């Protein structure tokens, strides 16, 4: 049968399977030669086709392996920037998500995805209910932000060490959220600034949507308060770490119309410390403050959602110990500070706010700074002096 359809079919079979040639009728020399040529061409075409397909699959797998694929997530936490502090941040977020199923953390860094995955696994043993996803790319590019589903994130943490990069990233994220009409969504941006001169620029870039933390000022306040109170660091770690109890802002509609003093004992497994009205937190407000619609209760609890107010006031026995009403004034305090850096003025300003007048602060350092004379003045409660010693 020498019909066109049959010849096309036979040519296709010879191109796909070289073994078909062995079953051909060898009485027609021209036919055999033609089919042999078709078979040889088919071998080359098939080899090229297999190579193209394999190369395409390999390229796609490499793209997925290197973290260039789109992340389809919702209500996740995005961390922009990969450095040594990433492990502490992820550990705290894992603890925060421990009472939630399917927690997601997305890390965007300039390193390869494989390197970030390996480093995170080496530093963190138990991920509990949280899955950590890494993506590689330049965070100031909208394509990388789009790949990371930033517009559907619950929170965005900018974890960069350079203030200039932080500000650029804030601008990029804000611009991207606006382009997606998601700027007014619940996602909140948090960033750390190391130089006070960049604070205002970072706040302007965030357009009221970013919480800018001045790192040196925060650490200086912690140091100033913990140096006089043994155990204060443990208290701060307990409050601000997600292990144990922490502060939560929750709305309880059933408390509307009640006075703040009346709700203090309604929570059995948490401690009420204040009210948040709009964006203004009020710690320890007057006892006759009335809870309004939309007010959120600030309370110290083990986890969010575990504490609910009871309907009836519990019976309180008044035969226990009472707080001392008399104010006990602190005595003059002497403090030795070893070393000097840019954080010293911040620490001294914080100490000057609450130390008793006449308290003495001595700073010992290898070499006196140029402004040592002026640095000793300007404090209301501190008598400051310098010692130049190793």
Tell what function each PLM region has.
Residues 1-390:
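Cytosolic regulatory regions of ion transport systems
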């Amino acid at each position: 049968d020498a019909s066109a359809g049959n010849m096309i079919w036979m040519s296709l079979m010879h191109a796909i399977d070289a073994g078909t040639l062995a079953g051909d009728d060898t009485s027609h020399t021209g036919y055999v030669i033609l089919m042999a040529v078709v078979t040889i061409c088919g071998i080359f075409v098939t080899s090229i086709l297999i190579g193209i397909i394999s190369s395409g699959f390999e390229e796609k797998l490499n793209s997925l392996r290197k973290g260039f694929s789109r992340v389809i997530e919702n209500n996740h936490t995005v961390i922009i920037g990969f450095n040594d502090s990433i492990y502490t941040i992820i550990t705290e977020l894992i603890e925060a998500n421990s009472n939630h199923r399917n927690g997601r953390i997305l890390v965007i860094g300039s390193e390869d995805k494989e390197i970030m995955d390996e480093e995170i696994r080496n530093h963190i043993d138990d991920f509990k209910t949280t899955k950590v996803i890494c993506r590689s790319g330049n965070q100031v590019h909208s394509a990388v932000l789009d790949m990371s589903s930033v517009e559907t994130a619950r929170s965005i943490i900018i974890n960069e060490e350079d203030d200039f990069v932080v500000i650029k990233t804030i601008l990029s994220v804000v611009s991207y959220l606006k382009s997606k009409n998601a700027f007014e969504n619940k996602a909140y941006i948090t960033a750390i600034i190391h130089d006070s001169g960049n604070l205002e620029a970072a706040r302007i870039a965030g357009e009221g949507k970013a919480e800018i933390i001045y790192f040196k000022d925060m650490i200086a306040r912690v140091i100033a308060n913990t140096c006089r109170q043994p155990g204060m660091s443990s208290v701060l770690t307990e409050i601000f770490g997600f292990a144990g109890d922490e502060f939560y802002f929750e709305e309880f509609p059933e408390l509307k119309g009640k006075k703040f003093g009346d709700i203090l004992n309604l929570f059995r497994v948490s401690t009420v410390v204040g009210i948040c009205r709009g964006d203004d937190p009020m710690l320890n407000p007057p006892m006759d403050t009335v809870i309004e619609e939309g007010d959120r209760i600030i309370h110290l609890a083990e986890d969010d959602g575990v504490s609910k107010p009871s309907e009836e006031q519990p019976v309180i026995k008044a035969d226990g110990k009472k707080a001392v009403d008399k104010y006990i004034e602190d005595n003059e305090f002497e403090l030795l500070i070893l070393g000097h850096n840019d954080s010293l003025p911040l620490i001294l300003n914080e100490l000057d706010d609450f130390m008793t007048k006449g308290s003495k602060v001595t700073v010992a350092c290898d070499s006196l700074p140029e402004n040592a004379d002026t640095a000793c003045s300007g404090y209301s409660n501190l008598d400051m002096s310098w010692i130049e010693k190793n």
